[in-house]
UniProtKB/Swiss-Prot annotation:
Function description: Catalyzes the NAD(+)-dependent cleavage of saccharopine to L-lysine and 2-oxoglutarate, the final step in the alpha-aminoadipate (AAA) pathway for lysin biosynthesis.
Family to which the UniProt record says this protein belongs: Belongs to the AlaDH/PNT family.
Motif Microbody targeting signal: positions: 370-372
Name used for this protein in its record: Saccharopine dehydrogenase [NAD(+), L-lysine-forming]
Lineage: Eukaryota, Fungi, Dikarya, Ascomycota, Saccharomycotina
Organism encoding this protein: Eremothecium gossypii (strain ATCC 10895 / CBS 109.51 / FGSC 9923 / NRRL Y-1056)
Assembly and oligomerization: Monomer.
Location within or outside the cell: Peroxisome
Length: 372
C-alpha cells in the first residue's frame, strides 16, 4: 500500500503548529514517502524548509482537489463553514468522538464522502497510551498564561483584562517574560501564588509544574494532585483556596465537577485564575462548569460572573501549545513518526487499525441515531 501524504495549511486563527515538520518530512522521504506540503501564511515553518527536506510545495487549500489516494494530514479541525463531503483519508484532531458541539456534522461529512478519519487524539499503542500528544507543551503554556494573568491582576485594575498574547520564539523567551511579570507583582507587595495542578503526574501536568518551577515557584507553592487526591469526588474547596487552579486532566468519562459557583461566589475566595488546559468547553461533562466560552490568543481570558470576592478569570484556549509552535511541533511530530512510518501497512498495523475501527464505531453510532 502506498503512502502519499499531503500536509494541509491550518486555518484556525493563530495556529502556527504543524503535524509534520521539516525534520520528520526528511525522514519520511528517505523511507520512500511522497510528501506534499501546502504553503501557509501562519505556519512557524517556512515552505523553503519543507522543500529542502524533500517535500513538494503546493498551493494553500489544494488538498480539496487532490487525488483520493493522498492522505490529508493536519492538526486542528476543518473550518466549520465547510460542509462538502470528505472523500480522503484524514489524519487530524477532529474533536467529534466525545459528543462535542458539531460532532454529528463532522462525522456526517466523512460518511457522505466515503472518507476515513484517523483521529490523532485516539492513536494508541498496545498499552492504550497515546502515541503522540501535545500535553507537555499545553501544560507548560497554560501555566505560563495562568501566572501571567495572576501577575496582571496584582498590577492592574479589575477593569483591565489580560491583553492579547502571541506565539513566542522559544521557551526561554516565554519564561523570561512571565518571570518578569511576577517580579513586578512581588514589587507591588504580592506574595508568591499557591498553584493547584490537577493531573500533575501526566504529560500536561508535568509541563505545568516545570513552567512554574522555571518561573521561581518552589514545591511549597505547587500543590500537585492526581487520581489519588481526586478519588473522593468534587467539588473541592481546596481549589477556591488556591490562587491559581490548572486543570490538566484528560476527560475520558463523566466525573463530578471539580469546582462550582457555590464555592467560588464567596467573599473569602483566594482563587483568581483558572486555566482549563483540557478545555472541554462544549463537553456536557466539563469538570470546570463555571464558564462556557473557549478563549483565544487575542482575548485570552473570560471573567467568571461572581458577585462576591475578587475578580476571577478563566483561560480556556484549546490550542495552548501554539504559544511555542516550533518546539511543540517538533516534539509531537517526533513522537508521531514511528506510527507514520507504518502507514504503508495501515490495514494491519495495530495503531492504525484500532483508529479505523474506532472511527467506524462512531459512524455506526451516528447511523443508529439517524434511524431512531
Amino acid at each position: 500500500m502506498s503512502a502519499i501524504l499531503h500536509l494541509r495549511a491550518e486555518t484556525k486563527p493563530m495556529e502556527a503548529r504543524a503535524a509534520l515538520t521539516p525534520t520528520t518530512v526528511r525522514t519520511l522521504v528517505s523511507h520512500g514517502f511522497k510528501i506534499y506540503v501546502e504553503e501557509s501564511a501562519q505556519s512557524v515553518f517556512e515552505a523553503a524548509e519543507y522543500a529542502a527536506a524533500g517535500a513538494e510545495v503546493v498551493a494553500t487549500g489544494s488538498w480539496r482537489g487532490a487525488p483520493r489516494e493522498r492522505i490529508i494530514v493536519g492538526l486542528k479541525e476543518l473550518p466549520e463553514e465547510d460542509t462538502f463531503p470528505l472523500e480522503h483519508t484524514h489524519i487530524q484532531f477532529a474533536h467529534c468522538y466525545k459528543n462535542q458541539s458539531g460532532w454529528r456534522e463532522v462525522l456526517g461529512r466523512f460518511q457522505s464522502g466515503g472518507g476515513l478519519l484517523y483521529d490523532l487524539e485516539f492513536l494508541q499503542d498496545d498499552r492504550g497510551r497515546r502515541v503522540a500528544a501535545f500535553g507537555y507543551y499545553a501544560g507548560f503554556a497554560g501555566a505560563a498564561l495562568g501566572l501571567r494573568d495572576w501577575a496582571w491582576k496584582q498590577t492592574h485594575t479589575d477593569a483591565e483584562d489580560l491583553p492579547a498574547v502571541a506565539p513566542y520564539e522559544n521557551e526561554q523567551a516565554l519564561v523570561s517574560e512571565v518571570a518578569a511579570a511576577c517580579e513586578e507583582a512581588y514589587k507591588k507587595g504580592a506574595r508568591k501564588p499557591r498553584v493547584l495542578v490537577i493531573g500533575a503526574l501526566g504529560r500536561c501536568g508535568s509541563g505545568a509544574v516545570e513552567l512554574l518551577r522555571q518561573c521561581g515557584l518552589h514545591d511549597k507553592h505547587i500543590i500537585r494532585w492526581d487520581i489519588a487526591e481526586t478519588a473522593r469526588g468534587g467539588p473541592f474547596p481546596e481549589i477556591a483556596a488556591a490562587d491559581i487552579f490548572i486543570n490538566c486532566i484528560y476527560l475520558s468519562q463523566p466525573i463530578a465537577p471539580f469546582i462550582n459557583m457555590e464555592l467560588l461566589d464567596r467573599p473569602d475566595r483566594k482563587l483568581r485564575t483558572i486555566v482549563d488546559v483540557s478545555a472541554d468547553t462544549t463537553n456536557p461533562h466539563n469538570p470546570v462548569p463555571v464558564y462556557n466560552v473557549a478563549t483565544v490568543f487575542s482575548s485570552p481570558t473570560v471573567v467568571v460572573p461572581t458577585s462576591q470576592g475578587p475578580k476571577l478569570s478563566v483561560i480556556s484556549i484549546d490550542h495552548l501549545p501554539s504559544l511555542l509552535p516550533r518546539e511543540a511541533s517538533e516534539a509531537f511530530a517526533s513522537d508521531l513518526l514511528p506510527s507514520l512510518l507504518q502507514l504503508p501497512e495501515r490495514d494491519t498495523a495495530p495503531v492504525w487499525l484500532r483508529a479505523k475501527e474506532l472511527f467506524q464505531q462512531h459512524c455506526e453510532r451516528l447511523s443508529k441515531e439517524a434511524r431512531l
